[in-house]
């Protein structure tokens, strides 16, 4: 089989799989708790299921934590792990109480290792305390137009 025919056959098979997947969404089959599929050019909703349900954000919360840290902090600034950040449950970068890393290192721990301890240390560094940082998170979400978003902590763990 020539290279052109092989390429065309591969494209045809890919289109079949893509068409079947889109067809399943159009029929409303999903195992997700919520979903929304929109047409990019028009913004028309092609499929939605529980689209306005309030659901836990889990670790996607850390994206807002990182955004605020980058916008409001200095990457070379030292960030010290408090007793509050030490031993936070869930995924961790295993900070020791009193350990100091740069904000940049904490951000790597937050986003690459999903470090809940790093999230709390960053929140305390940027906001002064976790509750004050959460206020910043919710204010920034409102500025971005995320009017149906509510943060309760910097790491997304259930309260």
Where are the model-predicted features located?
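Bacterial N-terminal signal peptides that target proteins for export
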Residues: 1-11
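Bacterial N-terminal signal peptides
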Residues: 10-20
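N-terminal start and proteolytic maturation junction detector
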Residues: 5, 18-19, 23
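Active-site-adjacent loops and short helices of periplasmic peptidoglycan-processing enzymes
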Residues: 22-159
């Amino acid at each position: 089989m020539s290279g052109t025919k092989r390429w065309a056959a591969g494209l045809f098979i890919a289109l079949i799989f893509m068409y079947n997947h889109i067809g399943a969404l159009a029929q409303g089959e999903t195992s997700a708790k919520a979903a929304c599929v929109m047409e990019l050019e028009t913004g028309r909703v092609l499929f939605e299921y529980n689209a306005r349900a309030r659901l836990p954000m889990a670790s996607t919360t850390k994206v807002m934590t990182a955004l605020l840290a980058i916008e409001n902090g200095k990457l070379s600034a030292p960030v010290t792990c408090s007793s509050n950040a030490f031993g936070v449950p869930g995924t961790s970068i295993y900070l020791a109480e009193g350990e100091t890393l740069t904000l940049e290192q904490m951000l790597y721990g937050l986003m690459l290792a999903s470090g809940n301890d790093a999230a709390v240390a960053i929140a305390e560094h940027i906001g002064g305390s976790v509750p004050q940082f959460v206020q910043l998170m919710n204010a920034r979400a409102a500025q971005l137009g995320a009017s149906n978003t509510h943060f309760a902590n910097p790491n997304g763990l259930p309260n």
